[in-house]
């Protein structure tokens, strides 16, 4: 399993849930050495700083050349292209976010290698929590147990004062947070 934006609130939980549900190997990408270290502390088998080298090269190395079967996409862009290249036949992609495009002022190109999805028989599916209500009770039960026994933990970045909310939002878009960004009022 490869999770992009893995040090964020969603990505960090996705990686831990994948491990809790038996994923053989979980790989995460993040934007600072500290976030990479945090992913390893959370139980990710491998993590890399996407700023250090091309994402595809780092992903291939982290997967030991065996490819990946599942990609949870929080980022889009170069991460999605790298994942498409490294996904094995029959691989699955959950499209949850595209943070690489959130601040873009120009139209962003589609993945240049999207045609790989045909030959590899990939499944790409949009993911919204609200679209998964039928799993809410099961998820709540499992998550409560995982939180109680420490299988899953979470991080929060807390900013004090409503007057600091605009900067907190900008910091969120710039990836300055680890885990959930909260404004305490």
Predicted segments — roles?
Residues 44, 67-68:
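Local beta-strand N-terminus motif with an aromatic residue
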Residues 54-66:
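Short amphipathic alpha-helix with an adjacent loop that forms part of the alpha/beta core around
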């Amino acid at each position: 399993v490869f999770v992009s934006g893995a040090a964020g609130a969603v990505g960090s939980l996705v990686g831990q849930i994948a491990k809790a549900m038996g994923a053989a190997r979980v790989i995460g990408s993040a934007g600072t050495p500290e976030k990479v270290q945090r992913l390893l502390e959370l139980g990710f088998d491998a993590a890399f700083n996407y700023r250090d080298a091309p994402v595809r090269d780092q992903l291939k190395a982290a997967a030991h050349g065996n490819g990946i079967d599942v990609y949870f996409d929080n980022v889009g862009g170069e991460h999605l292209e790298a994942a498409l290249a490294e996904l094995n036949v029959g691989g699955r992609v959950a499209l949850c976010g595209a943070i690489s495009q959130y601040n873009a002022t120009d139209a962003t190109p589609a993945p240049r290698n999207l045609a790989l999805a045909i030959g590899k028989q990939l499944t790409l599916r949009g993911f919204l929590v609200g679209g998964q209500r039928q799993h809410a009770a099961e998820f709540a039960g499992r998550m409560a147990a995982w939180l109680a026994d420490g299988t899953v933990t979470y991080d929060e970045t807390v900013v004090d004062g409503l007057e600091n909310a605009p900067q907190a939002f900008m910091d969120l878009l710039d990836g300055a947070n680890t885990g959930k960004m909260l404004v305490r009022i």
